[in-house]
Every structure is written in structure tokens, then in C-alpha cells.
């Protein structure tokens, strides 16, 4: 496979691999007829999302909170086609990147939406309705004036726990030791 040039407006052909800053984006570009539509352009009225209706099947569900450009979720959706993935971020621009990439790879087991983690779990996920929650990496807000903006508060950790199925798992990654200790303290409460 040829490495595509990434000039402005460069379009990738089927079979090509997309690169970002020299790093391959997971998956191979599919022919246009195999592309999917992964964007949830508007959230429904608040209430538990029926995952089976959204994805058209019964499958385990993983939510990626703060998905950014979707690199992790793309890889997970490709590696685990038997799982359904729901990726969210508050920034429309990065969600558009992820959506385009998932569409071009024909990933019917992935959806993207612009929404924050608290609202998603509180307003759209029922108790014990999710198998996995991924957060890579959460914004640490190290400035003492901004600490109150942290998402991973004890209340949010409790909300995640309530939304997980009995054998569900939470995955959190941070490169900030002090923030990791803060998260662990929240879990212990």
C-alpha cells in the first residue's frame, strides 16, 4: 500500500492507509459503497438510549469519553467487531475527524456524538447499560483555579459505576501522577 501525501484536500483511495504526523490511523480506506454513516448529528430527547435500536443488534457497548480524533475508538472498533462503540467529545471539529475516518473504514459498530461525559451518562445511559467506559486521558486541570472543572470527581466516578453492567470495566489513563492519586482517592470514597 502506498503512503498517501497529506496535502490540503488530499483524498485517499480505497486500500490506502491514512497517516497523521507520520503515524498510521487504524484501518484501511474502503470503497465508497462500503462507507457508513457514524455521526449521531443530534442527540435524542433525554432518556436511556436503546443500544440495540441504535446499532441494529445486541452487542456489548463501550463508551469512549473525550474521544478526540477517534484513534483509540477506531482501533477498538476494528479489533472488536462484535462490540458496539459510542465515542463522544465536546469539540465538534475533532468529532468530525473521527466520524470521517470511521465512515471511510465502513465501521457500522461505531457512532460519534458531540456531548460531554456527564450529560451522556446522566441523561442517556440507564443503570447497568454499559459494558466499558474509556477515558484517555482525562483533562487534569492542574491549575488550582481550574481544579473544579475536572470531570473525574467522586460523583462522576459513582455515576460511571452505576451505568456499568455488573462485570463492566472502567479504563482511565493519565501521565500525571498527582492526578492519578486524585482519581484513586475518588474511587476509594
Label the model's feature ranges.
Residues 68:
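Conserved glycine-rich SAM-binding loop
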Residues 1-63, 71-78, 100-127:
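S-adenosyl-L-methionine
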Residues 167-174:
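Conserved beta-strand signature within the Rossmann-like core of class I S-adenosyl-L-methionine
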Residues 83-86:
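Short beta-strand element of Class I
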Residues 65, 88:
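Conserved beta-strand/loop positions that form the S-adenosyl-L-methionine
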Residues 152-166:
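A short glycine-rich, Lys/Arg-flanked "PGG" loop and its adjoining helix->strand segment in the class I
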Residues 91:
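Conserved SAM/SAH-binding beta-strand->alpha-helix loop
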